[in-house]
From Swiss-Prot:
UniProt gene name: glnS
Biological process terms in GO annotation: glutaminyl-tRNA aminoacylation; glutamyl-tRNA aminoacylation
Catalysed reactions, as listed in the record: tRNA(Gln) + L-glutamine + ATP = L-glutaminyl-tRNA(Gln) + AMP + diphosphate
Positions occupied by motif 'KMSKS' region: 269-273
UniProt protein name: Glutamine--tRNA ligase
NCBIfam families according to UniProt: glnS, PRK14703.1
PANTHER family per the UniProt record, alphabetical: GLUTAMATE--TRNA LIGASE, GLUTAMINE-TRNA LIGASE
Family statement drawn from the similarity comment of this UniProt entry: Belongs to the class-I aminoacyl-tRNA synthetase family.
Superkingdom of the source species: Bacteria
A cellular component annotation (GO) from this entry: cytosol
């Protein structure tokens, strides 16, 4: 089967591209990813990144990275650096140099002058509030500004005064002269330029007038020779203005805009404004808090580039907005880590076991696999002594027939080791179990017990093979599926979205991590047996205190039968 041919035939965007390329044999596919440098990328941006760069690869075309930096009030160099890092982390390389809309400010200014000279733009002195009031509603037409019918010469002179800084912020703006009764509100004389007196991160203090996004975006696409301008559905109405500007300026190239559905993820918020509220209220730690779906947060949580790209492939590209199951995202990373993560044992909530029939100097070594199905991943050594730790949840004092782990008077097998029998417990002054006294059957290594009944298996670590560690158990930040739709989304915060545990990992494994702790670009993943998949948190870890973030649990709750595996360019 020709996979590329199948991909090209199954996606509405690919069908459009195929048609365009077939009708114009000299056409080369050229697209772009155009973020505004006013925040950090999230999983929704990843869908757009994957789509644009994968299509460029599929059609042997090009994909630019262009920062639409037309609002210096909200932009920052740190966002530019972060966005570039995230794209590279996902494994993509843009064509040529990084581009900025600000590189085209002079050309955009000249296009604005063109519109004025054609009688299609005018300088307005209405305030922002008045412009909103004059615009009308979906049910009522707008009304003309009293400044709408100025002469062309007057508008040329006023626009030049705007450029020179003769007006204060909000005192004047340039508006397109289209139709204040248009059924599309965006076509009711939209603002094209506004005055902002602030230093720009690229052009410094050269300009004090800045083009609006809608004006700069389509013209930047044209200047760069973009053939297919792909954006999400919220820009569908903007297409009218996109095409109007191109039609009424002397551009030599006409890109085409196409829309696809944005990515909406269960139990998540993608809005920058709302995430900032969560940060300001100390509900989350920052933009890389593993409970939110920014790319930096997902990376810190242990998600890999390939798992995110696989997720984007599975959800595909359609024109229908829907809410994507979070369990599908978890499925993608779990499937990968099941193949690649080193197996080791960790105790998150330790309780001590004393094996009374073993001497204090008793020591035995076991060689265990780093992965049960991949011998090439090697092995590591664990030691067995008369004092070990198990997880508190693996012991029950009172008899419970349904409980299959260690119980008083019952037996259990230790992973890779012997069967032990719980005979007595010791408690501290608060009534908590501090020690379990057990008998170790040394005849059961790799063998069944005398009664021929194999008990359940639990994990453990020898007291002499421990290194203390902190474990962060992350869960959904919200307890409803679609918090974005709630007016007061803060009412639905999951109070148990982060639980911290303090326990132990295998000493040798921990010491190897400590050697690498200064290099926070190294990604190390583990399956803590019977617990879940974890990664080292290089931000919070110190040499004397390792911190692990739970990436995902062991149990897969996503029903893969609900959706066929789809390439990023599939429906």
């Amino acid at each position: 089967m020709d996979t590329k041919k199948e991909i090209k035939n199954n996606n509405f965007i690919c069908q459009i591209i195929n048609k365009d390329l077939n009708e114009n044999k000299n056409l080369s596919f050229y697209t772009r990813f155009p973020p505004e440098p006013n925040g950090y990328l999230h999983i929704g941006h990843a869908k757009s990144i994957c789509l644009n760069f994968e299509l460029a690869s599929l059609y042997k075309g090009r994909c630019n990275l262009r920062f639409d930096d037309t609002n210096p009030l909200k932009e920052n160099i740190k966002y530019i650096k972060s966005i570039k890092h995230d794209i590279n982390w996902l494994g993509y390389k843009w064509h040529g140099n990084v581009r900025y809309a600000s590189e085209y400010f002079l050309k955009l200014y000249q296009y604005a002058q063109e519109l004025i000279k054609k009688g299609l733009a005018y300088v307005d002195h209405l305030t922002k509030e008045q412009i909103r009031e004059y615009r009308g509603t979906l049910n009522t037409p707008g009304k003309n500004s009293p400044y709408r019918n100025r002469t062309i010469q007057e508008n040329i002179e006023l626009f030049e005064k705007m450029k020179k800084g003769d007006f204060s912020e909000g005192e004047a703006c340039l508006r397109a002269k289209i139709n204040m009764s248009s059924s599309s509100i965006i076509m009711r004389d939209p603002v094209l330029y506004r005055i902002i007196f602030i230093k720009h991160h690229q052009t410094q203090n050269k300009w004090c007038i800045y083009p609006m996004y809608d004006f700069a975006h389509c013209l930047s696409d044209s200047i760069e020779g973009i053939t297919h301008s792909l954006c999400t559905l919220e820009f569908q109405d903007n297409k009218f203005l996109y095409n109007w500007i191109l039609k009424n300026t002397s551009v030599k190239h006409y890109p085409k805009q196409y829309e696809f559905s944005r990515l909406n993820l269960e139990f998540s918020i993608l809005s920058k404004r709302k995430i900032k509220i969560l940060i300001d209220k100390n509900i989350i730690e920052g933009w890389d808090d593993p409970r939110i779906p920014t790319l930096s947060a997902l990376r810190r949580k242990g998600y890999t580039p390939s798992s995110i790209k696989n997720f984007c492939q599975k959800i595909g590209v359609t024109k229908q907005n829907n809410l994507i199951e979070f369990s599908m995202l978890e499925h993608c990373i779990r499937k990968e880590l099941n193949q690649t993560a080193i197996r080791t044992m960790a105790i998150l909530d330790p309780i001590k076991i004393f094996l009374y029939n073993l001497d204090s100097n008793y020591k035995e070594e076991f060689i265990v696999p780093n992965h049960p199905n991949n011998p090439e991943m090697g092995t590591h050594k664990i030691i067995f002594t008369n004092t070990i730790y198990i997880d508190r949840s693996d012991f029950k004092e009172k008899y419970d027939k349904k409980y299959k782990r260690l119980k008083l008077g019952e037996k259990i097998r230790l992973r890779y080791s012997y069967i032990i029998h719980a005979e007595k417990i010791e408690k501290d002054e608060y009534g908590n179990i501090s020690n379990i006294i057990c008998y170790c059957d040394l005849n059961t290594l790799g063998r069944k017990p005398k009664d021929n009944k194999n008990p359940a298996v639990i994990h453990w670590i020898s007291e002499k093979n421990t290194l203390s560690a902190e474990f962060k158990l992350y869960d959904q930040l919200f307890n409803i599926k679609n918090p974005e739709q709630q007016e007061n989304f803060l009412l639905y915060i999951n109070s148990k979205s982060l639980i911290k545990k303090f326990g132990f990992i295998e000493k040798k494994i921990g010491e190897e991590i400590q050697k690498k702790i200064s290099n926070n670009n190294i990604e190390i993943f583990f399956q803590f047996e019977r617990i879940g998949y974890f990664c080292i948190d290089f931000i919070d870890s110190k040499k004397n205190q390792l911190v692990f973030n739970r990436t995902v649990g062991l149990r897969d709750t996503w029903d893969s039968k609900k959706i066929k595996t789809k390439n990023i360019t599939n429906n």
